[in-house]
């Protein structure tokens, strides 16, 4: 977090709670580190604030936190995670108010540097948009593109904006 009025960086306290927002097979310990990438914050249908974080370490996961301000300090309560299937490599996330989410799958995890360069130069399709709901991932039809990266969901209009950074 950063307070833009003071340019102060705020390192929140993280407490591990029961996994109620993720996949029950996904586990996290207090001692586990995070490898954060794309993030999104929404006010859920139940009025709580949910932060979704793509994490590349120690495993490929999507981490879910509740944000609360207590005694003038921000606290993150870990509320669950979702294991990312081995065939997917996520970049960004956009949450829905019901706790489900969309994520961009940029390219195969095992892509070689040569294949990545060729894909980038030719702007070939390398990934697509994925939706997670009811503890299951599904590919969003017609979302293939070259290097899908950042996304923003406008849920009330049922529109998602996708940045294909290689074309």
Give the positions of each predicted feature.
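Blade-loop segments of beta-propeller domains
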Residues: 1-45
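Short loop/turn segments immediately following beta-strands, especially the blade-tip
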Residues: 4, 65-74
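Surface loop/turn motifs at the tips and blade-to-blade linkers of beta-strand repeat domains
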Residues: 12-16, 28-31, 81-86, 140-145
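Beta-rich catalytic cores
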Residues: 35, 58, 89, 125, ...
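Residue-level detector of Asp-centered blade-edge/turn motifs that repeat once per structural unit
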Residues: 42-48, 95-98, 155-157
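Conserved beta-propeller blade signature
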Residues: 50-53, 100-102, 159-162
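Short, conserved, GDST-rich strand-edge loop motifs in beta-rich repeat architectures
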Residues: 53-55, 103-124
């Amino acid at each position: 977090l950063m307070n833009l009025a003071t340019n102060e960086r705020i390192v929140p306290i993280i407490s591990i709670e029961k996994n109620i927002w993720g996949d029950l097979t996904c586990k996290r310990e207090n001692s586990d580190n995070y490898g954060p990438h794309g993030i999104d914050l929404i006010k859920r249908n139940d009025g709580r604030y949910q932060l979704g974080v793509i994490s590349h370490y120690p495993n490929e996961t999507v981490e879910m936190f509740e944000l609360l301000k207590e005694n003038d300090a921000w606290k993150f309560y870990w509320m669950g995670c979702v294991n990312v299937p081995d065939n997917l490599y996520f970049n960004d996330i956009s949450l829905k108010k019901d706790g489900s989410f969309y994520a961009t799958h940029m390219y195969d995890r095992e892509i070689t540097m040569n294949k990545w360069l060729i894909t980038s130069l030719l702007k070939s399709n390398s990934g697509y948009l994925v939706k997670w709901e009811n503890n299951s991932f599904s590919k969003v039809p017609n979302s293939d593109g070259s290097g899908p990266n950042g996304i923003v969901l406008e849920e009330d209009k049922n529109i998602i904006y996708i940045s294909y950074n290689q074309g």
